[in-house]
């Protein structure tokens, strides 16, 4: 990926095949030379390794609410988004310690941080991000039980007790594993995944905003349930969030 050729805005692309078990996607956020940008990061159940031009590398832990961001004009931010079951093993720490936190990579993995600290050019940083990610994943592969559990929890009707039994763990064991590997327990992960399902449906049909129908499709009990959860996870009403994403 030629980072310098990317247009202003947010872009995602697939990770190399060797990393796809652990990495959901690679991404970049670019601002134009003429204007800064403010944004809002919403929970997705993932942890990201991030390189920001002028700052260096840091880790964005799993969020449980919206996080406001600001980028100066002419800035590039690069990211590696770990799958829910991969962040904790790759970083070698319980991700519950990074829930709703941002931490310099130097505090967690000094060797990879030193490598990225020397990168001033975004294209060089992009290549070094992949090298650093490969080293992290080699040290800690995704947790197979949590990988399986996360797939099952995409079903809004799934019960945590049944998911635990399906993956061969007690409910207490599943909670502990999810806290360490994902950053929060299975019920919170399920809430976040259901919310992302709502967002995906809104993005797919921006011209049709039938919130009651979308709420039912995404697994919410009713539109009021969607409104409560959207407020907790995004700080907005569903209609406001949908309008913002369509803009």
Predicted features by range, described:
Residues 178, 190, 229-231, 242:
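DNA major-groove recognition helix of helix-turn-helix
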